[in-house]
Amino acid sequence: LRVLSDPSEEVILCDLRLLTQICSRADEHHFRLFLTDLLERFAADRRLLESWGSLIIRQLCVHLQTERVFPVLADILETYEDLEFASIMVQNLNMILVASQELKPLRRRIRALDTREHQQLFVRLYRCWSHNAISALCLCLLTQSYEHAYNVLRIFADLDVSLSMLLQVDKLVQLIESPIFTSLRLQLLEPEQHPFLVKCLYGMLMLLPQSSAFATLRNRLQAVHGLGHLTMPNDERPHTRYARQATPDVPWNELLQHFRTVQLRHERLRLATERLTDNEPRRRVQQREPAPFARMSFTANAGTRSARE
């Protein structure tokens, strides 16, 4: 694994081929140990994660099957003790899942949710994705779980929405405008059939400050609003259900509670970190300046010595 830190892409690719050959013959226990060690290396070397993390994960998916790699990574990260790293890693995995060509088959499977296996895969990813609120929201939009996405968005009202979260919402708006979410944009043509999708996008609009992403999303929703004046004959109206909340085999309420619990843990960590950061300058000032009592004692002792003299 140390070779993965080599600056040469060719060396990294050769090393990955060797690692994948070893892992292809390993049982699930040793495969999990390998991915755990890989995550620990990413946690210790953030530069490696930023520079080569996406390439390494995508190559593992190509050679070891995405359906094997991603669920195990999700299981490990779900209970990861370093919450900050877990959130960063989930954000990276989400971008790989959404945008990488290598993960197109996995996207098809979790979009379908038509078999128990696909539903269990979604649940495993979602429980891990809860470490990063915007990634969890993106996963819901990707799987067309619009009612759940709206419920997730409502939980944001109880959270401290940080600048980092707003920047991630900005990126999510850009993703919605990309080819990956073409089906989502086309579903906006049927707002009566996908009311929670419309409400979710309006909720994102309310989160965003006045910015280019705000203008992009507002323009998209204004175009949808104009459809409200159109009507269709009853016999031509599509008879579709309100997307994913009607899938009974997925424990939606349990997942929502899990998301809330994990996000509250992250919020407590952020608040504790902010308090430490705020107190650090005060400690430095106190270390530089003598305490008032010490100055008084010094003055008093000096006065006593003068009187004796």
Indicate where each model-derived feature is located.
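Tandem repeat protein-protein interaction scaffolds
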Residues: 2-10, 14, 21
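Eukaryotic scaffolding regions of large macromolecular assemblies
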Residues: 8, 19-22, 27, 32-309
